[in-house]
Each structure stands twice: as structure tokens, then as C-alpha cells.
Amino acid sequence: MIKKGALTGLLLFGIFFGAGNLIFPPSLGTLSGQHFWSAIAGFVLSGVGLAVLTLIIGTLNPKGYIHEISQKIAPWFAIVYLVALYLSIGPFFAIPRTATVAYEVGISPMLSKNMTGIGLIVFTTLYFAAAYLISLNPSKILDRIGRILTPVFAVLIIILVILGALKYGTTTHQQASQAYSASAFGQGFLEGYNTLDALASVAFSVIAVTTLNQLGFKNKKEYISTIWVVGLMVALGFSAMYIGLAFLGNHFPVPAEIIAKGNPGVYVLSQATQAIFGPTAQIFLAAMVTVTCFTTTAGLIVSTGEFFHKTFPKLSYKVYATVFTLIGFVIANLGLNAIIQYSVPVLQILYPITIVIVLIVIVNKFLPLSKIGMQLTVAAVTLISFASILGQQFHIAWVSDKVNALPFAQASLPWLVPALVGILLSLFLPNKQKSERFEIES
């Protein structure tokens, strides 16, 4: 049981951990100022809690979320939703972001300011060329490198956090930004979306099921117990890491001009490493971040390419891998801040939909729900999410007013009450169904 738990924990850790996630907690710490604890609570809830819960619920159906969504909503919606999800955790956001994080955290601090632009082009060219070659012939070597280096990198980050807290823990924090002053918990909750882990959990739950079955559980009780125990361990571990990094960002001195540029997390991670371990530590940090990000990039190209080839088999896997690598390369050269900025509206649509799907699946494990009720619930959440972004991005006052009139809108959760009401109504509407039981594969 302990061995299986350790192996499962390593699996979950590998799924969630990405060097890109390291920049968001310290950024939150810097920008949240005096509202730190409310902000980090929101971040941990969406960045860790939702991700772990989504993966756990996904492992309770060996056929994955595509089967759950097809049965409860509609097959066409499952395809549209998963295509949008894979494009988000693939070529549009996560793949280019891993490359730019590796460059911004590891390489850029060692270059002069007039070399950062050309440096990014050269770095991403070499980076994506190597990732593409490996994605055409994925091997266990990549997985083994990731399994070894990821825990090592995590331990080093923990050491950085502890030493940073001892050195800077009494330093006065920055003043909170306008967004965090208005709603610290809500802004922190939205920042947690940037980790992309809840979306990745939907995609990787089938992989998790396959790996778990290979461990040879004796019965369903042992299987479920292991999932929940390890899920709790991973949640506590990541929460501690995120809180530590955010605390470091909250107290580490950051110049005003860095804050004005957006995302001071890169600055905190790089400069704190040099301040605590010395200037030569930047070289080691560059190597660790680059390799960790690289394994993630290659893995995402493979998983996204395989999904699209399986879903739309007219094109070969090689074509999809080529296209997604090129898209990732082009978007990466827009820069980290640009990638984060344009990803926010999409994530603010996909995350509420993902959350309500997970809620529906959980409730439906215990109680029969009306299919039309579930469909209307997802439709309502989708509509509210689109309306919220429409009002924000295009400054349509009447749309924003309607959204802001909903409960919890100030906490960035205007869809929450409609979702709960929809699930409640699904208990009483006709055409009820209940989730299928699963069995452990022998």
C-alpha cells in the first residue's frame, strides 16, 4: 500500500509540477501586499484544490472525461470542449509559456538588455527544434529525466523558500495592486487559473487510470483509498510550496519599474536565487528550469498531437506535432507577459465550465440527475462566462452590469450560484441518470 501510494504520488506530482507554475505564486505575493492571506487562499483553492479534485474524479471513470461529458451533456460538446482544452494546455498557452519561462527565468538574467530580443529567438529555435525531434520519437528517457529532475528541482525550491523566509520574512511588503485591493480572494482565485493544472487534469486523467491499473490493486476500495490519500498529500505539498513562494514574493524587495512591467514573479525567482545562493547559482537555475520546462513541452506536444490524431485521424500524428510545434514557437516569441495576457480571457471561460462539469460528475456519483438539467446548467455557466469576458474586454456596460448583479460577482464567481441552482433543479427534472459504476481491471 505504501509503495503504491508513493508511486501514485510521484505520478500526480509529475502531472502537476511545472516550472511555469513557479512564477505565479511570487507574483501574487508581490501584488497582493497587505491582502496576502486572502489572495493566496483563493490561489490555492483554484490552483491546487480544483486540480487535485479534477484528477481524482477523473480517475474514477476509466473511460475519462470524454465519456462523462458525452453521456451527461452531449458528444459534440465533449469534442468542442476537449479541443479547446487541449489547445489551451498545448500550442496556444502551455507549450509556448514553458519555453518563455525557461528563457525569462534561466537565460535572460545572464544577458544584456539589448540582447534579450534576439536571445529569445535563438533560444526558442533551439528549444523547439529539440522538443520536436523528441516528440517524433518519444521515449522513456524523457519520462525518466522528468521523474528525476522534477523532485530535485522541487526540493531546491523548498530550500529557497525556507532560506528566503528567514532572510526576508521581516521585510515590509509592497502595497497591494488595485485588483487585489478590490477583491483579494477573487483575484487570487483567478490567478490560480494560470497554473492550467485543472484543465491538464481533465486531459491526463486517462493516463493516470492506466498507470494506476498497472500497479495491481486488489480491489476497488484499495484503489479509491490510495487515490484520496495521495491526492491529499499532493494537495498539502503543493499548497505549502505555493504559499512559501508567494510569501517570498510578498517580502522580497521588487523595484516599482519591475512591477509596472507585469508579472514580477520571474524577477523574484531569479533575483532571490542569486541573493541567497550567490551569482553562480543563476547558471544552475537556468539548467534546472530549462530541462524541467523542456520535458513538459515535449510531453505536451506528444499528448496534444495524439489526442488530435485520435479525434481527427485524417491527418497523421507527425503533421499535428509539426503544426503544434510551429504554433508554440511563434507564440513563444511574443514574450511571457503577452502570453499570460491573452490567455486570461480563455481561461476565465474554460475554468468555470470545467468546475461545473466536475461538480456535476461528483453529485451524479451519488444522486441521479436530469440530463436536460445538466445541459442547461453547463449552458448557463458557459453563457455567463462568455458574457463576463465580453463585458470586460469590449467594455460593454450593460453586459457587465448584468453579470455584476449576480451573487459573488465581486469575488469573480458570478457563475457559482446559477451552477448550484442548476444542479439542484436537475434533481427534480425528468430523464434522470446516474454515473456508471467502475471496476478495477484485472
Identify the meaning behind each predicted range:
Residues 91, 95, 154-180, 198-199, ...:
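Hydrophobic alpha-helical segments and their helix-loop junctions in multi-pass secondary transporters
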Residues 137-148, 185, 208-237, 255-268, ...:
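Hydrophobic, small-residue-rich membrane helices and short re-entrant helix-turn-helix hairpins
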Residues 167, 370, 374-442:
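A generic transmembrane alpha-helix motif of multi-pass inner-membrane proteins
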Residues 49, 53, 152-164, 227-253, ...:
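Selective recognition of specific alpha-helical transmembrane segments in multi-pass small-molecule
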Residues 9-17, 163-170, 179-245, 284-293, ...:
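Hydrophobic, membrane-embedded alpha-helices of multi-pass small-molecule transporters
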Residues 65-71, 241-294, 345:
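TM-loop-TM module centered on a large, flexible mid-protein loop between adjacent transmembrane helices
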Residues 60-64, 68, 126-149, 214-217, ...:
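Membrane-water interface regions at transmembrane-helix termini and the short interhelical loops
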Residues 135-164, 343-355, 374-383:
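Membrane-interface loop-to-helix entry segments
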